[in-house]
Amino acid sequence: IWESSYVSILTKRLTNRGFLTGPMLPIYGSGAVVMLCATYPVQSSDVGIFLLGLIAATILEYVTGVVMETLFQVRYWDYSDKKFNIQGHICLSSSLAWGVFTLLLIRVVHPRISALLEKIPQNVCFSALVVITIVFAIDFASSFHAAMDLRQILESITNLKSDAEKLRERFIVLTDSVSETLRDKIGTIKKPESSRIEEFQTSVSECLEKLYSLVPKEKTADVIRLKERFAYLGELKNAISKRMDFRKIILLKGNPMLTSKKYADALNSLKEQIGLNKNK
């Protein structure tokens, strides 16, 4: 809840923060368990609780960040702009916060929750545990599938841009077969940008029509093939757009600070499509 509130304030929009569609954040649940286990031998020392909680939670955050980036090719958090960070996955300020949270968990939160649970009948607790576990498992499986599909979409958009650039280069070669005085009538095709694919397609269509009427007859077949390949890329683009369903949109909106080293341009394109980059 606190992170969703924090991000909502930063982005000035209501944000359901996290990897899952529901309100649960696995890293915090896992972090709490790790904190409890790691600090068990030093329960009498606040300094020991702070230090061991800091170290254990930082290790968990680093490992989780590396694994998620490897799987999904995106970062759900990035501390690269923070001082004393390691590969952007962890940083000093975050680690210090983990230490403070560990103290709060051990000294304030956990004792009260334990006392509350002791007052609730065991069969009620067990039933609640079963229901929550089932809901969590379904949400996790669905969210994992959406995240993997998002990675494939980002890869497809990147490949689409690369293919479009190759066809653009072929267009330039065909344009060279036209006399210099006629080239101005054809126009030029700008480099394809993932965030401006529609404009690129319009530019291509107009230029190819002009090129077809001006190239030597022996080159018209090449222009026709080029038009067909551009049309195919358009179909691929539409197919990619249809894969952006509700769950993937929720995933992006719930993580507006999502970054990707490998697919940065493609990710920015998707963010623009759903209105996340309007203020940039």
Label each region the model flagged.
Residues I1-K280:
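Aromatic-rich, lipid-facing transmembrane alpha helices and their immediate juxtamembrane interface loops
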